[in-house]
Regions:
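ADP-ribosyltransferase catalytic core
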Residues: 117-133
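Short S/T/G/P-rich N-terminal loop/turn motif that feeds into the first structured element of a domain
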Residues: 3-112, 128-144
Length: 144
């Protein structure tokens, strides 16, 4: 019986390949807690970044070679997340989540993002409201 003829061995190869790919991936995950009266201004800056990303990571610019996925979120902050019936605070939570093919792609991303006219504002927001700043995080679990 050939090595590839055994479905179990083929499955092991597939899993090992996925583990190798996963081990190369790196992430940027940023979390912000922003006063509600500043949330729209913060979101406007984040929308500038997402618009830049749409172009920078387009197929024409070989984007899939560097960026795997990206999503930005906005949610009211609960007083008690274990009991949402207690209501929300006067703050909004934003997250920026970007998954890259490698740490080199993150370096490329940061280097190019810093050239944008909105980036000083982006940095100010990070300094003022950033609560979780992770550049180059390793994925240790993922579904899809």
């Amino acid at each position: 019986m050939s090595f590839m003829g055994n479905g179990v061995n083929k499955k092991i190869i597939t899993i090992k390949s996925k583990e190798k790919i996963m081990s190369d991936m790196r992430c940027i995950n940023l979390g912000y807690v922003v006063p509600k009266d500043q949330a729209d201004q913060v979101q406007a800056v984040f929308k500038k970044h997402s618009a830049w990303m749409e172009n920078f990571y387009s197929d024409v610019n070989n984007g899939p070679d560097h960026l795997i996925s990206s999503f930005f979120t906005r949610a009211d902050e609960f007083i008690d997340p274990m009991d949402p019936s207690k209501g929300v605070t006067d703050k909004v939570i934003f997250t920026i989540n970007e998954r890259f093919t490698s740490i080199e792609s993150i370096h490329r991303h940061v280097e190019n993002a810093m050239k944008n006219d909105y980036f000083p504002e982006f940095g100010e927001i990070m300094d003022k409201y950033g609560t979780a700043i992770s550049l180059g995080g390793e994925i240790y679990h993922s579904i899809r």
